UniProtKB/Swiss-Prot annotation:
It comes from the Bacteria. It comes from Porphyromonas gingivalis (strain ATCC BAA-308 / W83). One of its GO terms (biological process) is translation. InterPro entries: Ribosomal_bL17, Ribosomal_bL17_CS, Ribosomal_bL17_sf. Residues 129-140 have a biased composition (Basic residues). This is Large ribosomal subunit protein bL17. GO terms for molecular function: structural constituent of ribosome. PROSITE patterns: RIBOSOMAL_L17. Residues 128-160 are annotated as: Disordered.
Length: 160
Protein backbone atom coordinates (compact mmCIF):
# COMPACT_ATOMS: atom_id res chain seq x y z
CA UNK A 1 0.00 0.00 0.00
CA UNK A 2 1.20 3.50 -0.85
CA UNK A 3 0.03 5.12 2.37
CA UNK A 4 1.95 8.30 3.27
CA UNK A 5 4.05 8.21 0.08
CA UNK A 6 2.88 11.45 -1.53
CA UNK A 7 6.35 13.00 -1.23
CA UNK A 8 9.84 11.78 -0.38
CA UNK A 9 10.51 11.96 3.36
CA UNK A 10 14.28 11.95 2.71
CA UNK A 11 14.94 9.97 5.91
CA UNK A 12 14.26 13.00 8.10
CA UNK A 13 11.65 14.16 10.59
CA UNK A 14 9.14 16.74 9.37
CA UNK A 15 10.81 19.77 11.00
CA UNK A 16 14.28 18.79 9.75
CA UNK A 17 12.95 18.17 6.24
CA UNK A 18 11.12 21.52 6.16
CA UNK A 19 14.20 23.40 7.38
CA UNK A 20 16.46 21.65 4.86
CA UNK A 21 14.13 22.34 1.91
CA UNK A 22 13.73 25.96 3.03
CA UNK A 23 17.51 26.44 3.14
CA UNK A 24 18.00 24.69 -0.20
CA UNK A 25 15.26 26.81 -1.81
CA UNK A 26 16.88 30.02 -0.54
CA UNK A 27 20.27 28.86 -1.87
CA UNK A 28 18.75 27.98 -5.24
CA UNK A 29 17.16 31.41 -5.55
CA UNK A 30 20.30 33.27 -4.49
CA UNK A 31 22.84 31.21 -6.48
CA UNK A 32 20.56 30.08 -9.38
CA UNK A 33 22.17 26.60 -9.34
CA UNK A 34 23.07 24.15 -6.58
CA UNK A 35 24.74 20.74 -6.47
CA UNK A 36 22.89 18.05 -4.52
CA UNK A 37 21.57 14.49 -4.67
CA UNK A 38 18.85 13.59 -7.16
CA UNK A 39 16.35 12.70 -4.40
CA UNK A 40 16.82 16.07 -2.69
CA UNK A 41 16.63 17.88 -6.03
CA UNK A 42 13.32 16.23 -6.89
CA UNK A 43 11.92 17.10 -3.44
CA UNK A 44 13.21 20.67 -3.84
CA UNK A 45 11.57 21.01 -7.25
CA UNK A 46 8.20 20.06 -5.72
CA UNK A 47 8.83 22.63 -2.95
CA UNK A 48 10.04 25.51 -5.16
CA UNK A 49 7.86 25.39 -8.29
CA UNK A 50 4.60 26.48 -6.57
CA UNK A 51 6.57 29.16 -4.74
CA UNK A 52 7.87 30.55 -8.04
CA UNK A 53 4.33 30.55 -9.44
CA UNK A 54 3.17 32.64 -6.46
CA UNK A 55 5.78 35.31 -7.23
CA UNK A 56 4.12 36.23 -10.51
CA UNK A 57 1.79 38.59 -8.67
CA UNK A 58 3.70 40.86 -6.33
CA UNK A 59 1.31 41.44 -3.44
CA UNK A 60 1.91 41.66 0.28
CA UNK A 61 0.04 38.40 0.76
CA UNK A 62 2.16 36.50 -1.78
CA UNK A 63 5.34 37.94 -0.23
CA UNK A 64 4.26 36.73 3.23
CA UNK A 65 3.48 33.26 1.88
CA UNK A 66 6.87 33.13 0.13
CA UNK A 67 8.63 34.28 3.32
CA UNK A 68 6.94 31.49 5.27
CA UNK A 69 8.54 29.05 2.80
CA UNK A 70 12.00 30.66 2.64
CA UNK A 71 12.65 32.42 5.98
CA UNK A 72 15.33 34.50 4.23
CA UNK A 73 14.68 38.14 3.39
CA UNK A 74 17.58 38.36 0.91
CA UNK A 75 16.26 35.40 -1.06
CA UNK A 76 12.78 36.93 -0.93
CA UNK A 77 14.05 40.21 -2.37
CA UNK A 78 15.90 38.38 -5.15
CA UNK A 79 12.86 36.20 -5.82
CA UNK A 80 10.40 39.05 -6.25
CA UNK A 81 12.90 41.27 -8.07
CA UNK A 82 15.11 39.60 -10.64
CA UNK A 83 13.69 36.07 -10.71
CA UNK A 84 10.03 37.08 -10.98
CA UNK A 85 10.83 39.33 -13.96
CA UNK A 86 12.55 36.49 -15.83
CA UNK A 87 9.87 33.85 -15.23
CA UNK A 88 6.88 36.13 -15.81
CA UNK A 89 6.01 34.71 -19.25
CA UNK A 90 6.92 31.05 -18.50
CA UNK A 91 3.84 28.89 -17.76
CA UNK A 92 5.71 26.45 -15.48
CA UNK A 93 8.78 24.25 -15.39
CA UNK A 94 11.05 26.81 -13.76
CA UNK A 95 13.75 24.35 -12.69
CA UNK A 96 15.99 21.88 -14.51
CA UNK A 97 17.77 18.84 -13.05
CA UNK A 98 21.07 17.88 -14.72
CA UNK A 99 22.38 14.52 -13.55
CA UNK A 100 26.16 14.46 -13.16
CA UNK A 101 27.06 10.99 -11.94
CA UNK A 102 27.57 9.30 -8.60
CA UNK A 103 29.21 10.46 -5.37
CA UNK A 104 32.49 8.73 -4.57
CA UNK A 105 31.83 7.87 -0.92
CA UNK A 106 28.34 6.32 -0.99
CA UNK A 107 27.54 6.11 -4.72
CA UNK A 108 24.56 8.46 -4.35
CA UNK A 109 23.24 9.88 -7.63
CA UNK A 110 24.28 13.54 -7.83
CA UNK A 111 22.95 16.40 -9.94
CA UNK A 112 22.69 20.13 -10.45
CA UNK A 113 19.31 21.76 -9.98
CA UNK A 114 19.07 25.18 -11.59
CA UNK A 115 16.62 27.85 -12.58
CA UNK A 116 15.92 27.40 -16.30
CA UNK A 117 16.16 31.07 -17.33
CA UNK A 118 19.60 31.53 -15.76
CA UNK A 119 21.71 28.95 -17.61
CA UNK A 120 23.66 31.16 -20.02
CA UNK A 121 25.42 28.18 -21.63
CA UNK A 122 22.21 26.51 -22.77
CA UNK A 123 20.57 29.80 -23.74
CA UNK A 124 23.66 30.79 -25.77
CA UNK A 125 23.81 27.44 -27.58
CA UNK A 126 20.16 27.72 -28.58
CA UNK A 127 20.78 31.15 -30.09
CA UNK A 128 23.88 29.95 -31.97
CA UNK A 129 22.07 26.91 -33.36
CA UNK A 130 19.29 29.11 -34.69
CA UNK A 131 21.69 31.33 -36.68
CA UNK A 132 23.61 28.53 -38.45
CA UNK A 133 22.54 27.28 -41.87
CA UNK A 134 23.61 24.26 -43.89
CA UNK A 135 24.75 26.35 -46.84
CA UNK A 136 27.37 28.17 -44.78
CA UNK A 137 28.92 24.86 -43.70
CA UNK A 138 29.28 23.71 -47.31
CA UNK A 139 30.98 26.94 -48.29
CA UNK A 140 33.46 26.74 -45.43
CA UNK A 141 34.37 23.14 -46.22
CA UNK A 142 34.71 23.95 -49.94
CA UNK A 143 37.02 26.89 -49.15
CA UNK A 144 39.20 24.69 -46.96
CA UNK A 145 39.54 22.05 -49.70
CA UNK A 146 40.38 24.66 -52.35
CA UNK A 147 43.01 26.29 -50.14
CA UNK A 148 44.53 22.97 -49.12
CA UNK A 149 45.03 21.65 -52.68
CA UNK A 150 47.39 24.41 -53.98
CA UNK A 151 49.39 24.32 -50.73
CA UNK A 152 50.24 20.65 -51.31
CA UNK A 153 51.31 21.22 -54.95
CA UNK A 154 53.71 24.07 -54.16
CA UNK A 155 56.25 22.01 -52.14
CA UNK A 156 56.41 19.35 -54.90
CA UNK A 157 57.35 21.99 -57.46
CA UNK A 158 60.05 23.33 -55.14
CA UNK A 159 61.59 19.86 -54.67
CA UNK A 160 61.99 19.26 -58.46
Amino acid sequence: MRHNKKFNHLGRKAAHRKAMLSNMAASLILHKRIFTTVAKAKALRIYVEPLLTKTKEDTTHSRRIAFSYLQNKYALKELFGDVAAKIADRPGGYTRILKTGYRLGDNAAMCFIELVDYNENMLGEAAKKATKTRRSRKRKSADVVVEAAPAEETPKAAEE
